[in-house]
């Protein structure tokens, strides 16, 4: 039985390669039949905002990779992180079909998984 893995995205999408590399790792895990759970919290919430155009700034777009991960493993966003940033679920990209969860539920995800990796 594969290990249960939780990938926590808490960094903003731009300014470093941390998040992009995290999405690459998640994609590689899926290719190895490990289906990680993805949790977006803190500034990681900004990865999920609709109408982003990183290529306009010369940055790599992660939209298709994240959409694929959404289709395969699902994406969870902490509701409190949205609210703290003045965001609503309507601000999230519909392509990602994000499930908003409470901080208590996010804590449950931490407990349920054997391995936790943070980006």
Where are these regions (language model features)?
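An anion/phosphate-binding loop that grips the pyrophosphate of nucleotide cofactors and donors
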Residues: 113
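Short beta-alpha junction loops
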Residues: 42-45, 81-82
């Amino acid at each position: 039985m594969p290990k249960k893995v939780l990938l926590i995205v808490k960094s903003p999408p731009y300014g470093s390669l941390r998040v992009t590399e995290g999405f690459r790792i998640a994609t590689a895990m899926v290719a190895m039949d490990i289906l990680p759970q993805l949790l977006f919290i803190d500034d990681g919430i900004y990865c999920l905002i609709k109408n982003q155009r990183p290529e306009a700034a010369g940055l790599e777009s992660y939209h298709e990779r994240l959409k694929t991960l959404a289709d395969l493993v699902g994406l969870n966003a902490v509701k409190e992180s949205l609210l703290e940033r003045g965001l609503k679920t309507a601000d999230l990209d519909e392509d990602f079909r994000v499930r908003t969860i409470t901080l208590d539920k996010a804590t449950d995800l931490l407990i349920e998984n054997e391995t936790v990796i943070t980006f």
